[in-house]
């Protein structure tokens, strides 16, 4: 008779940074795509969590050319390098990142309205 392996207690409010092996692999490498309201109807789209292996300035250049918007890379004190784009580009960024193979669909987290 085989022993059941998952009989450990699980605390959902515990710190995720303790290094417990209860979380599945790959949960920390999400790419977060957020939208921020500016003045009036203007919005900013931010992309955070792209690996350091990729040149973010080249990605911004490709985004600007593909989506016909302005963009830049800013240094955020908490999140590191973050890509900022003008306008609501959430769907476009998701499709583009999956299309070029930089991220899978389940690695993208879209936040906003």
Curated annotation (Swiss-Prot):
The record marks 41, 65 as: Binds 40S ribosomal subunit. The modification N-acetylserine is found at residue 2. One of its GO terms (cellular component) is eukaryotic 43S preinitiation complex. Keywords: Acetylation, Cytoplasm, Initiation factor, Phosphoprotein, Protein biosynthesis. GO terms for molecular function: ribosomal small subunit binding; RNA binding; translation initiation factor activity. It is found in: Cytoplasm. The modification Phosphoserine is found at residue 2. Residues 1-21 are annotated as: Disordered. InterPro entries: SUI1, SUI1_dom_sf, SUI1_euk. Its main location: cytoplasm. Pfam families: SUI1. NCBIfam families: SUI1_MOF2. Belongs to the SUI1 family. Component of the 43S pre-initiation complex (43S PIC), which binds to the mRNA cap-proximal region, scans mRNA 5'-untranslated region, and locates the initiation codon. Together with eIF1A (EIF1AX), EIF1 facilitates scanning and is essential for start codon recognition on the basis of AUG nucleotide context and location relative to the 5'-cap. Component of the 43S pre-initiation complex (43S PIC), which is composed of the 40S ribosomal subunit, EIF1, eIF1A (EIF1AX), eIF3 complex, EIF5 and eIF2-GTP-initiator tRNA complex (eIF2 ternary complex). Interacts with EIF4G1; in specific 5'-UTR length and AUG context. Interacts with EIF5; which in a mutual exclusive interaction associates either with EIF1 or with EIF2S2 on a common binding site. Interacts with RENT2. This is Eukaryotic translation initiation factor 1. It comes from Gallus gallus (Chicken). The lineage of its organism: Eukaryota, Metazoa, Chordata, Craniata, Vertebrata.
């Amino acid at each position: 008779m085989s022993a059941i392996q998952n009989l450990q207690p699980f605390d959902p409010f515990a710190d995720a940074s303790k290094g417990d092996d209860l979380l599945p692999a790959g949960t920390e490498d999400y790419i977060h795509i957020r939208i921020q309201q500016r003045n009036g109807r203007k919005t900013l789209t931010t992309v955070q969590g792209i690996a350091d292996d990729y040149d973010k300035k080249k990605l911004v250049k490709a985004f600007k050319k593909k989506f016909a918007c302005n963009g830049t890379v800013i240094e955020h004190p908490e999140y590191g390098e973050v890509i900022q784009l003008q306008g609501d580009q959430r769907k476009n960024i998701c499709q583009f990142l999956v299309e070029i193979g930089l991220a899978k669909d389940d690695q993208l987290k879209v936040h906003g309205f």
